[in-house]
């Protein structure tokens, strides 16, 4: 059931093997194989494939993926995947932080969708619509309006409220 050891090191073999296993409903069986492959050969297609796996323990999968932050802290693909996994695990605050950093590094349609979903979930339909629209622009190969993305992120992560001024007792 595992990739034979002689060819396990070849990403060109691991990728279609794992994709086939995921398609066959055997994703949990290849999760470790994908983690090992990513440790040997950091490739975006392997990372995206890892995100397709939906383990019963989503929090464990998120923790495993967060281990990659050390060497890949500024990898927009990883941050997007972490946002997706955080949502699956029910960690909305982590998802917001990861997707925000991902968008700062490289705006993508998928990241805009996550922002839109988070805003929609909060009931901010206008801002969600803006995020979705920017994602559609990116998916169509157009340039996103950075100001609109920043506005949606600001709504998603408002700055802390200033402390009210205390009256001078004099």
Residue map of PLM features:
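Start-of-helix register in tetratricopeptide repeats
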Residues: 12, 45, 77, 110-111, ...
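Solenoid-repeat scaffolds in large eukaryotic assemblies
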Residues: 14, 27-30, 61, 78, ...
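Alpha-helical linker/edge segments of TPR/alpha-solenoid repeat scaffolds
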Residues: 53-68, 123-134, 141-145, 154-170
